[in-house]
C-alpha cells in the first residue's frame, strides 16, 4: 500500500466571538479597555512595591512577581485578540499557534506555582511570626520564584512535546479566540485518545489536586489565626481571604476547561475569557482594594510624583 500524502497546515483560522461588524467594534473597545486596565494595574503594583521601602517584605516581593506574571499572561492572548477584532478573517500561523500554547502554559503554570509559594509565605507568617523574616529571607524568596518559573516551564514543555509530533492536515478551524491544547488537539489527523488522557492528567487532574491542597492550606491558616490578637487576626484574615478569592478565580475556570477538555461546551469561550482576560485585570484590584498598606503606599507614590512635577 502506498503511503498517504498529507499536507501539514500552515495556519489556523480562529472563529473568535462574532461575525457581526458592529459587535466586533464594541468588543474591541471593551477588551482594549480591559487590557489597558490590566497593564496599568499590574505596572502600578510593580512600581509601588519597587519604590516604597516599607513594602520590601517577602509577601510584597512575591506579589510584585505575581503582577509581572499577570501582565505577561494577558499579553499572550489579548493583543492578538484585539487585532483580530479589526479583521474579517482571523488567522494565526502554525508556529505562532505553538508559541502561544507554550507561553500560555508557561505563565499559567507559573501562576499556579506562585499561588502555592504565596500560601507557604502566609503559613510561615502566621505560624512563626517571630522567625518570619529569618525564614523567608531573600535567598529563599528568589529560590521560590525561580522554582515557580521552572515549574511553569516544565509544564509547558510537556504540553508542547505532546502536540508538536502530531500531523495537522485539515480542517484548520479553531472555535476560539486563541490557541490552546484542547482545541488544537481536536484537529489532529490521527487518534489522540492516549494524548487526551495524558493532557487531562497533566492539566485537569493536577489543577483539581492543587486547588484542593491550596484550599486546605488556607483553611489551616485561618484556623491557626484563632490564637492571634484581634487586630493582627483581622489583618491576616483579610490577606488570606484575598488569596482565596484569587485562587478560586484562577482555578475554577481552569477545572472547567481542562477536566473535560475534549468535549466542547457552549460556555467554553466565556469561561476562557474569565481567566485569560478578566482575572489578570481583577487581581491587582483585589490585592489593592483589600490591602491598606498597598493603598497607603500608592498614595505616597502619588504625592511624590506630584511634588516632583512641581
UniProtKB/Swiss-Prot annotation:
Any one Gene Ontology molecular-function term assigned to this protein's record: G protein-coupled receptor activity
InterPro entries: GPCR_Rhodpsn (IPR000276), GPCR_Rhodpsn_7TM (IPR017452), Olfact_rcpt (IPR000725), Olfactory_Receptors (IPR050427)
Glycosylation sites noted in the Swiss-Prot or TrEMBL record: 5
Coiled-coil intervals, chain numbering: none
S-S pairs: 97-189
Record topology, Cytoplasmic segments: 50-57, 121-139, 220-235, 290-310
Chief location of this protein within or outside the cell: membrane
BP term (GO), one: sensory perception of smell
Cellular localisation: Cell membrane
Transmembrane feature ranges: 26-49, 58-79, 101-120, 140-158, 196-219, 236-258, 270-289
Keywords of this entry: Cell membrane, Disulfide bond, G-protein coupled receptor, Glycoprotein, Membrane, Olfaction, Receptor, Sensory transduction, Transducer, Transmembrane, Transmembrane helix
Name of protein: Olfactory receptor 4D1
Amino acid at each position: 500500500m502506498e503511503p498517504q500524502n498529507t499536507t501539514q497546515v500552515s495556519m489556523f483560522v480562529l472563529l473568535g466571538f462574532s461575525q457581526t461588524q458592529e459587535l466586533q467594534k464594541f468588543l474591541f473597545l471593551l477588551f482594549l479597555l480591559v487590557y489597558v486596565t490590566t497593564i496599568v494595574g499590574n505596572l502600578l503594583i510593580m512600581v509601588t512595591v519597587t519604590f516604597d521601602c516599607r513594602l520590601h517584605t517577602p509577601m510584597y516581593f512575591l506579589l510584585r512577581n505575581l503582577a509581572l506574571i499577570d501582565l505577561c499572561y494577558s499579553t499572550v492572548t489579548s493583543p492578538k485578540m484585539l487585532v483580530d477584532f479589526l479583521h474579517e478573517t482571523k488567522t494565526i500561523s502554525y508556529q505562532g499557534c505553538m508559541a502561544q500554547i507554550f507561553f500560555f502554559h508557561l505563565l499559567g503554570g507559573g501562576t499556579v506555582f506562585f499561588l502555592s509559594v504565596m500560601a507557604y509565605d502566609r503559613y510561615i507568617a502566621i505560624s512563626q511570626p517571630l522567625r518570619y523574616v529569618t525564614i523567608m529571607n531573600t535567598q529563599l524568596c528568589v529560590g521560590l520564584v525561580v522554582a515557580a518559573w521552572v515549574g511553569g516551564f516544565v509544564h509547558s514543555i510537556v504540553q508542547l512535546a505532546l502536540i508538536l509530533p502530531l500531523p495537522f492536515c485539515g480542517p484548520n478551524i479553531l472555535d476560539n479566540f486563541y490557541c490552546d491544547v484542547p482545541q488544537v488537539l481536536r484537529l489532529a489527523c490521527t487518534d489522540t485518545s492516549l494524548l487526551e488522557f495524558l493532557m487531562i492528567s497533566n492539566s485537569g487532574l493536577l489543577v483539581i489536586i492543587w486547588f484542593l491542597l491550596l484550599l486546605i492550606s488556607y483553611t489551616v491558616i485561618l484556623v491557626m489565626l484563632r490564637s492571634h490578637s484581634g487586630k493582627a487576626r483581622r489583618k491576616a484574615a483579610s490577606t488570606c481571604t484575598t488569596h482565596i478569592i484569587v485562587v478560586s478565580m484562577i482555578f475554577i475556570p481552569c477545572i472547567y476547561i481542562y477536566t473535560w477538555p475534549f468535549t466542547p461546551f457552549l460556555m467554553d469561550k466565556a469561561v476562557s475569557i474569565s481567566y485569560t482576560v478578566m482575572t489578570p485585570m481583577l487581581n491587582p484590584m483585589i490585592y489593592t482594594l483589600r490591602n491598606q498598606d498597598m493603598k497607603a503606599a500608592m498614595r505616597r507614590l502619588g504625592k511624590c510624583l506630584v511634588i516632583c512635577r512641581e
